[in-house]
Amino acid sequence: MTTIVRIFGREILDSRGNPTVEADVYLADGSMGRAAVPSGASTGEHEAVELRDGDKGRYLGKGCLNAAKHINGEIATALHGKDATQQGEIDGAMIALDGTPNKGRLGANAILAVSMATARAAAAAQRTPLYRYLGGVGANTLPVPMMNIINGGAHADNSVDLQEFMVAPFGAKSFSEALRMGVEVFHTLKKVLSKKGYSTAVGDEGGFAPMLKSNEEAIESCLEAITQAGFKPGENVGICLDPASSEFFKGGKYVFKKSDKSERTSEQMVEFWANWVRQYPAILSIEDGMAEDDWAGWKLLTDTVGSKIQLVGDDLFVTNSTRLKQGIEGGVANSILVKVNQIGTLTETLEAMQMAANAGYTAVVSHRSGETEDPFIADLAVATNAGQIKTGSASRTDRICKYNQLLRIEERLGSSAVFPGRKAYSR
């Protein structure tokens, strides 16, 4: 019996020591699913609303007791007796119960925790791995990891404007080999930075956060580490960037406030990226190269470099089918970043990914900077055959647990496991 008999929500802590929400869903046959919700530091304006208590006397206003209360009250009552295998019905019931366009009444964090926990409970009831339950017999593609090795922007207190510099070991023959390659680059980068006298303290996502002199020094340090680790930039290990441009878009200008204070118009920002793509041919992907509502700038960027590299919309699309449809119709970007907590239910996440695939857009399943020990997104990446995952560096257990889950899945799939390599970026 996959009937829901009990739902329980609680407040726990994320990887930054901030409160977040966890939910347990119990079924009539004794099966149980548990899921915890991540939280972002650089959040898009159009994301579903994360409910916080606002009590400054407790966790500096970031408590999640009200979200947990909603789970234990309204949500538990509404879902009692429903079939956990009917994910669309479960998620639809919570959306209707909330009654707002952005899940702001009950909280997207409350709704998502229950949504994911329900899927886990249903998978447990069927004695099926989560990736297989969600994706069926065709779920066999392991993702190329985007490993964040230098942090800047809102993720680190340093002089780097661009938020993430990542390596993607696409030249590997398997996920486990790709992970090894990325880890070796990460450890080599530590030596490169130490030799130059830089700190090797890490940021929120486990990448290093040194006080580099410029954004150029950051990417060049990554390239140096790739080479010193014995790999070839652009041939078997690529560079992926997440500038998180909305974070430095002020008054209609892109302002590099952390480094040289330079300002750029949208046209100049596009030219900046075009120059980087020419100068650094190892660049495979740029995420949020333009601000979330700079649609004209995004269109120009897509027309300028979209045929050469992957252009990922994160704050632009916020895993939202409505915004993604607008982008597809306008010829903007060619890839979507998938963050389950941006939209707030598993059903809507899967709908956005399907829409992207139908339009020939790639998809990158992603963590948030405030993570938990829940490896749900590892299973999601395999379930959807996304081919790419972005889940931090080779440090911090909140990041490593996703990689370890992917290793387990690859082992379980055996000879049927597929590693897409460079094909992951094909459209």
Swiss-Prot record:
UniProt EC number: 4.2.1.11
TM annotation in the entry: none
UniProt: Mg(2+) binding residues: D242, E287, D314
Keyword Secreted set for record: yes
Cofactor remark from the record: Binds a second Mg(2+) ion via substrate during catalysis.
One Gene Ontology MF term: phosphopyruvate hydratase activity
Pfam families (UniProt xref): Enolase_C, Enolase_N
Catalytically driven reaction(s): (2R)-2-phosphoglycerate = phosphoenolpyruvate + H2O
Cofactor requirements of the protein: Mg(2+)
InterPro entries the record matches: Enolase, Enolase-like_C_sf, Enolase-like_N, Enolase_C, Enolase_CS, Enolase_N
Intracellular or extracellular location(s): Cytoplasm; Secreted; Cell surface
Enzyme class, first EC level, given as a word: lyase
Gene3D superfamilies per UniProt: Enolase-like C-terminal domain, Enolase-like, N-terminal domain
Annotated binding of (2R)-2-phosphoglycerate, by residue: Q163, K339, R368, S369, K390
One of the protein's GO biological processes: glycolytic process
Keywords: Cytoplasm, Glycolysis, Lyase, Magnesium, Metal-binding, Secreted
The protein's annotated pathway: Carbohydrate degradation; glycolysis; pyruvate from D-glyceraldehyde 3-phosphate: step 4/5
Residues annotated as catalytic: E205 (proton donor), K339 (proton acceptor)
One cellular-component annotation, GO: cell surface
Role this protein plays: Catalyzes the reversible conversion of 2-phosphoglycerate (2-PG) into phosphoenolpyruvate (PEP). It is essential for the degradation of carbohydrates via glycolysis.
Family, similarity comment: Belongs to the enolase family.
UniProt cross-references to NCBIfam families, sorted A to Z: eno
Record-given protein name: Enolase
Lineage, top ranks: Bacteria, Pseudomonadati, Acidobacteriota, Terriglobia, Bryobacterales
Gene: eno
